[in-house]
């Protein structure tokens, strides 16, 4: 669930209701600023993933630039890094970002798969984008960092990402909800899980 600064999708009351009534782990996406970090710390979900935000965007458009904003991030993230919440940061597949995340003391990254998904849709540079992800998940794993991935993943394009053994979690929301309008949520989740399981075995 993504509680945006502008509360465009859901707000903190929705988040509290979800945490109270859903008996599965919740992954909270928030911006890396003091207000949102306080919400994350108070609500205490199992996972918090820090993402960049732009008020004009329709959806998250890229990864957080940890290397460029390292000094500021190390300061604002300090309180939540001292909790028991599992922290990850949403980044583009880039070794400098991975190095910065390791220096920050964060043990998990979520790789932005949007460029791969766009390439897949256009049938252009798919191998190039996949190679970039593959090289970076291997680099992250070698540096002791857990690898998650997500953004733009669908029934058609998820297999190649799920087949990467270093990736231990995929975060897929928008597509499953969109598909569930026509096919039912349980059916959409089951179909996606079957594709992922088949690709990762």
Where are these predicted regions, by residue range?
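Hydrophobic faces of well-ordered beta-strands that scaffold small-molecule active sites
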Residues: 1, 26-30, 48-50, 87-89, ...
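Alpha-helix-loop-beta-strand connector modules within alpha/beta enzyme cores
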Residues: 7-34, 68-88, 126-149, 192-196, ...
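C-terminal helical cap(s) of enzyme catalytic domains, especially alpha/beta-barrels
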Residues: 19, 62, 121-126, 178-201
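Glycine-enriched alpha-helix->loop->beta-strand junction motifs that scaffold or abut catalytic
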Residues: 21-24, 42-48, 82, 102-109, ...
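Catalytic cores of alpha/beta
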Residues: 34-43, 93-104, 149, 153-167
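Hydrophobic, well-structured mid-protein blocks that either form specific transmembrane helices
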Residues: 48-107
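Glycine-rich phosphate-binding active-site loops on the catalytic face of alpha/beta enzymes
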Residues: 49-57, 108-120, 166-185
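Histidine/lysine/aspartate-rich catalytic loop segments that bind and position anionic ligands
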Residues: 86-139
């Amino acid at each position: 669930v993504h509680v945006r600064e502008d509360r465009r999708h859901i707000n903190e009351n929705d988040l509290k209701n979800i945490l109270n009534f859903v008996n599965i782990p919740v992954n909270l996406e928030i911006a890396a600023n003091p207000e949102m970090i306080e919400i994350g710390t108070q609500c205490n979900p199992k996972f918090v993933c820090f993402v960049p935000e732009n008020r004009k965007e329709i959806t998250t458009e890229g990864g957080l630039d940890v290397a460029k904003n390292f000094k500021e991030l190390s300061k604002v993230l300090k309180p939540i890094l001292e909790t028991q919440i599992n922290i990850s940061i949403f980044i583009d597949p880039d070794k400098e970002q991975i190095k910065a995340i390791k220096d920050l003391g964060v043990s998990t990254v979520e790789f932005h798969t949007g460029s791969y998904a766009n390439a897949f849709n256009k049938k252009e540079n798919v191998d190039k984008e996949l190679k970039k992800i593959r090289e970076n998940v291997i680099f992250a794993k070698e540096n002791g960092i857990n690898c998650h991935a997500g953004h733009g993943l669908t029934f058609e394009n998820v297999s190649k990402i799920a087949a990467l053994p270093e990736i231990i979690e995929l975060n897929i929301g928008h597509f499953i909800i969109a598909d569930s309008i026509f096919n039912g949520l349980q059916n959409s989740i089951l179909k996606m899980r079957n594709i992922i399981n088949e690709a990762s075995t």
